[in-house]
Amino acid sequence: ANNNSNNGKKLRETLSETCTRRRAEGRNIVAGINTGFFNSHDGFPRGFHIEYGEPVFINNPTVRQSLSNHRPGFTFFEDRTVSFDNRSFTGYLKVNDTDYEYYSVNDTIVRLNNTDGYDANLYTSRFRKEPHPGIYNPVGSDALFVVGRCSQQMTVNDGWFDATVTAIVDGRNGASVEVPFVSEKTDWVLQVTGEKAAALAAALKVGDAVRINANVSIGSVSKQIIMHNSSMYRFLNGGNWNAVNDATLMPATCIGADQAGTTVKLVCVDGRTSIDTGMN
């Protein structure tokens, strides 16, 4: 396993492999360029990621707020404009007339090995129990798990989605339970702890109708998103070159946007020889 280290190929999917896989899925791919993070050894992307509106990975607020390189991302909106602005996220489960906030999607915070205090977090079919043979995603069981099924796959900035509670698993107070995982794109699991778990346990039963949403703002804009990917750094933003002042000669790629936000620019830098200037 990669163990989240930059230690070579191992289980990571290269960009070429991603293009090959997507073409086999029927995507019309002309070329690919790295914009940020890669799939980790845990089997899900690192950083904020939205794919055809689906919230594939939304990292928890502590990471989003404390790490400046986790704030910006490349966004391609449904109206065919683009942006590199910072992003924010809010998500809610509506039970009757009460909204219960959740804070992340498919984040390792569900392992319950931190003290951040975010008491409700969602995971979907993207979060797999065994993403690769012999590699497992642990989920903390000392929580209430609400399993739901939407009438259609939930996408960001598309309002409320109707859902039905299909299972409730209560692992609180040390109860021995099997943590639920889902395999359908319409399904999700909400892991809840603390007072919010007590409130939901009292309010819900299997078969109940609920509603759920996922809202992403890019800068001051909140509209339908086709793709969003963590860009790590904004080297080319609003038509302005903002590359790091690094004399190290190394290859680099990035994706940028013009000032109007209507043109995408792909940048490839060859820094492998002494005659190259790298990112300078």
Predicted regions and their residues:
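Gly/Ser/Thr/Pro-rich low-complexity, intrinsically disordered segments
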Residues: A1-N280
